[in-house]
């Protein structure tokens, strides 16, 4: 038998520092925010924010509110958004904050739904936008943008004043949602300019307890003026087509205490920096992030595919590494506005090293360009439920690495794991997933965790297990819930919920391929009752629950020594990925939905289920006294373990399934365009003329008056696809092997034409699944539409 993987928790070498940083709310602000060396606090309590990036100016304003509710239901507590200057002032002096550019309304919607807000005000933001967000007229005025050149600072000062006017009264001193403001972006070597920008923003009237800066690339910051925020992506669009999977991405699937990622933005830095953490940053500031990859954009020359497990494993690994702020870029995709004068995407034509699609900025995000739910949304929501209940416990815990560590970033044989713990309890993190190069199964695995003091070493599980390929998880150690101490469990904490009868239920998610076991501290327990198929054995001060079949009925009931009632419910992994918790019909409830996404709308006093199923179902704990009501539909109910399951039977035909649409070939493709290159010798998007002369053209017969939420799904191959209504470009895509989705509700009335260019053999373009440098023909193979219907679930 292999020897256990072991870690010894010695406690911190020195206590965390407090009061040494100037970040704080104004006097008198309720629940003031403060920053210590290892943790953020709010109202004196550890605070573990979860921020998600959503660019309001890349999304229809009429849909903002529902998308913010989706983000909140996904566990996002803070919405971050670039304020993209060129979107607001493409023409000098014509500053627009109307429609999709209404910054104030967006911030107010965040506040309305209890979400904090972080405007990332630039002025240079990157964001794969033309000029990094700097309008052309600004760049024409100065030879030294992003410096203290007076010719640059003058328009920036006016821009900051315009932002401040929009956000007036929305700071925390005024009861508003703004918890932080980011200055600039990826500016690593000009601390004096960063300080100038901060002072200008403050003089303009902007205010927040936290002023932040991106901190990757060996950043130099003005001392104690900006909170450094870090990032990490599972893939890149900005590296070379033939460069393979970058080591700077590989590192994020290991447990490490190195915060910096020297790879982010490296294509725009004139010098090569070596990743590292200046001692004054890592010792003075907590590990906070703003750009953990929720997905990845695609460039013409490099089109990475990011899968849900890539996003989920990276996020969970960062918590194990010591993160106290999970910030995702992007959490929600969008579409570039068309621009009045020029296209607004990053491109070779503007001197940038990457050609991006003109319109789509989907980013393969957890919520897509048209609000689509992605599997990565479920993976992250499961982690965010954990943080909502236990983040305050985890945040001050130190990250401790085990005795045996991987020998380097190409070591696939050594188990990757870490523990977050204090001297009383902790969480054990394991990651056995990475993209591109799968990690092997880990047979005969067990752990020993030695807490400080004279207590016994915690050994788990009861017998060694095999950790499956692709698994990543967090297991609790000595977790106390409502008077019960759970010594350990081989299942991940999800959340707690009151069952409506005075009993607290701790919900756990089983790890695929590993039998769930619960070790209960008998000193906190008087009675234990388990399902009939489970086994309960006792030894010393511990009761061990084994042979538990996870599911909605896998409830272990406990009476605690202090007179409380506790349940431990172990869901199977697939069911747990459909777990939502929020205020519903007068109480906090746990909802399980495998048929679509759930949002909680307290203002409308309803829950909405976004589902493509003809008869969607969902399970609720605790169940309301009367079944929810769906206008125009019948709601059936049935027991489902400790839940009540409701099924919606539509009064209409309820059709939401996929419908195949007629596709007509208007013109076959010609010869693939020759390859041209731009900055850094990277392949460029073919010239506009080729879309008229070389592209295959198809006509897609769209349904008349499609219901809201209808997506067109195009199965295709080729190089570049563009969709038109009349002469207007309405959607575009670089081929990466994925189905191309277009929201029909965004399209003007008219015939849809799709043009597809073929990819030439030998083209220096990375396409996942491409065999060598083979040509890819231009074909629209199938078109279908599917409707995701919002079902309002109202109190019965």
Description of each model-found segment:
Residues 1-78, 777-779, 784-793:
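N-terminal carbohydrate-binding accessory modules
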Residues 2-9, 22-25, 372-796:
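Non-catalytic C-terminal accessory domains or segments of carbohydrate-active enzymes
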Residues 48-61, 84-103, 138-158, 177-191, ...:
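The substrate-binding groove and active-site-proximal loops of carbohydrate-active enzymes
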Residues 64-131, 202-203:
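Aromatic-lined substrate-binding rim segments of carbohydrate-active enzymes
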Residues 93-101, 112, 123-150, 154, ...:
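Aromatic- and acidic-residue-enriched segments that line the glycan-binding/catalytic groove
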Residues 115, 197-209, 256-354, 420-423, ...:
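Catalytic-core region of carbohydrate-active enzymes that cleave or remodel glycosidic bonds
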Residues 120-123, 172-185, 201-223, 264-273, ...:
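Aromatic-lined carbohydrate-recognition surfaces of secreted/lumenal glycan-active proteins
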Residues 186-209, 214-258, 265, 270, ...:
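Substrate-binding cleft/loops of secretory-pathway carbohydrate-active enzymes
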